[in-house]
From Swiss-Prot:
Keyword match Transit peptide: no
Residues that coordinate or bind GTP 1: 10-17, 57-61, 120-123
Gene designation: der
EngA-type G domain mapped to chain residues: 4-168, 177-352
Residues annotated as binding GTP 2: 183-190, 230-234, 295-298
Protein name listed in UniProt: GTPase Der
């Protein structure tokens, strides 16, 4: 089950970006934040009271002129309604209630989504009375904060995580493997999914996904049970291209969040784009299993060396994830389509693989004998013991004399030894080094 998503909504200049940046300033144990395709930050991984969740920064979706405030706010609220599990509705306690606030509140009431009404810019105790007029929005009791001074943020987050308890964390873990198909429009994502569904007889159901442009399809196969997440992307025309791009990116990121395995689809006739690199880079950063599929392979003139050459070029462009698996298919003709879910399952199996501690230490001991750690400064790294502490991705702790002695080249050597011995293709692995005093 994916982490809950929390979106911050509000008209321009109420302090959305200030609030987001304050929360992303390590004040609530941010795990990671990632720039999107646009220059604005879009996502931040957060934790509060042991609840992990994802924050969406909708601060960049703002009108440039006042005459389109209401229409823009309607779109922004719609994005939050579609994607978020909980919505923070931010209003300005200094300026007071505005027509745009009422417009958004009306949409939020209809959505039936949990909303935490937050009155910002309450910098002093005497300003508390400014919050009362916001009861007229019919959203519930407001929480007062000052995002610039970091006042009241704990109370606000307490209210937010209250909504997680029943729906997000107490449910049974879904045993299905979630696969997100990501890539540019018209690369063949929907065609491939339709092909997969058409060839499998045991389809459970099709249900609307969390976003207007995503559809979840459930399918059972001999390789396992899967949820196929199609991120179609926005196709409607708009004068503001960056705004539409941002909507599309947010939707794609939401699908990545929910996925175990991310399949990046590339058009063989076009190659990989900068946006492809950034989107799959996000999946890499948050430790998803990854499969790269080159579609429309039937349209490429080729000889016996073409595939190897194409794969080599892809690996150069995706050098930050050398572990990725590759598959060349044609969704149109069905070429190698039968291997898609099988290969995705292989990625998932490696993503969730556990290695016995005894075998693990034998491999590392042998690796040390073959190549001794280098001296860093005046000390040489000593590795006493290794154990695996988690999966998704496989995570290993090395107990050593001094973590500062680990050289990046030797860390890469240890990772390569683990990969050669245990096959972690399709998934990243994490190596952590912890000091243990020699007895």
């Amino acid at each position: 089950m994916g982490k809950p998503i929390v979106a911050i909504v509000g008209r321009p200049n109420v302090g959305k970006s200030t609030l987001f940046n304050k929360l992303a300033g390590k004040r609530i144990a941010i795990v990671q934040d990632t720039p999107g395709v646009t220059r604005d930050r879009i996502y931040a991984e957060a934790e509060w009271l042991n609840y992990k969740f994802t924050m969406i920064d909708t601060g960049g979706i703002e009108p440039e002129s006042e005459d389109i405030i209401v229409s823009q706010m309607r779109r922004q609220a719609q994005i939050a309604i579609e994607m978020a599990n909980v919505i923070i509705f931010l209003v300005d306690g200094k300026e007071g209630l505005a027509p745009a606030d009422e417009e958004v509140a009306q949409m939020l009431r209809k959505s039936k989504k949990p909303v935490v009404l937050v009155v910002n810019k309450i910098d002093k105790l005497k300003d508390e009375n400014n919050a009362y007029e916001f009861y007229n929005l019919g959203i519930g009791d407001p929480v007062t904060i000052s995002s610039s001074q970091a006042l009241g943020l704990g109370d606000m987050l307490d209210r937010v995580v209250e909504y997680f308890k029943d729906d997000e964390l107490d449910g049974e873990e879904d045993e299905r493997i979630n696969i997100a198909f990501i890539g540019k429009p018209n690369v063949g994502k929907s065609s491939l999914i339709n092909k997969l569904l058409g060839e499998e007889r045991l389809i459970v159901s099709d249900i609307p996904g969390t976003t207007r442009d995503s559809i979840d399809s459930y399918v059972d196969t001999e390789f396992g049970e899967f949820t196929l997440i199609d991120t179609a992307g926005l196709r409607r025309k708009s004068k503001v291209k960056e705004e539409i791009e941002r909507y599309s990116v947010i939707r794609t990121y939401a699908s990545i969040e929910r996925a175990d395995v991310c399949i990046l689809m590339i058009d063989a006739t076009e190659g990989i784009s900068e946006q492809d690199q950034k989107i799959i880079g996000y999946a890499h950063d948050i430790n998803k299993a990854i499969l790269v599929i080159v579609n429309k392979w039937d349209l490429v003139e080729k000889d016996d060396k073409t595939m190897d050459k194409f794969k080599k070029e892809l690996k150069v462009n995706l050098s930050f994830m050398p572990y990725a698996k590759y598959l060349f298919i044609s969704a149109k003709t069905g070429q190698r389509v039968v291997k898609v879910l099988q290969t995705a399952k292989e990625c998932y199996d490696n993503y969730t693989k556990r290695v016995k501690t005894g075998v693990l230490n034998d491999v590392i001991s042998q690796a040390i004998m073959m190549k001794e750690p280098p001296i860093v400064g005046t000390k040489r790294l000593k590795i006493y013991y290794v154990t695996q502490i988690g999966t998704k991705p496989p995570t290993f702790i090395f107990f050593v004399n001094d973590p500062a002695c680990i050289h990046f080249s030797y860390q890469r050597y240890l990772e390569n030894q683990l990969r050669e011995n245990f096959d972690f293709q399709g998934t990243g692995i994490k190596l952590e080094f912890r000091e243990r005093k020699e007895k």
